[in-house]
């Protein structure tokens, strides 16, 4: 049962890491020009079974015109050691602080594409026809 999914401990620690990283990003203590005036959402954290690597899925909600989402993620990865030290204050109970890795969260984009497909006239027509067939 190796692929049974994350354990309860992994889920609990991942949520604590997500909360701590989100709190640090919200406070704005990272002094970097790329991250200036940008709101970053930490949607999910996945942690390895040994609790030593935490992959944080982030999505920049507002970026400047000359800053891409990839630049934001690269900047967060550049400052991951600093962030790791900062979250250590919130996660004192852990023996080892997990290494933070940041990835761009594309789930919001996928949701909007699916929503647009479901609202398309072709799908609406098919749904309308299937409702009449059931009557």
UniProtKB/Swiss-Prot annotation:
Gene Ontology CC annotation, any one: cytosol
Superkingdom of the source species: Bacteria
Any one Gene Ontology molecular-function term assigned to this protein's record: ribosomal small subunit binding
Signal sequence bounds: none
Keywords: Cytoplasm, Ribosome biogenesis
A biological-process GO annotation: maturation of SSU-rRNA
Entry's localization field: Cytoplasm
Principal localisation: cytoplasm
Disulfide pattern: none
Subunit (UniProt): Monomer. Binds 30S ribosomal subunits, but not 50S ribosomal subunits or 70S ribosomes.
Job description of the protein: One of several proteins that assist in the late maturation steps of the functional core of the 30S ribosomal subunit. Associates with free 30S ribosomal subunits (but not with 30S subunits that are part of 70S ribosomes or polysomes). Required for efficient processing of 16S rRNA. May interact with the 5'-terminal helix region of 16S rRNA.
Family note: Belongs to the RbfA family.
Protein name per its UniProtKB record: Ribosome-binding factor A
Species this chain originates from: Bartonella tribocorum (strain CIP 105476 / IBS 506)
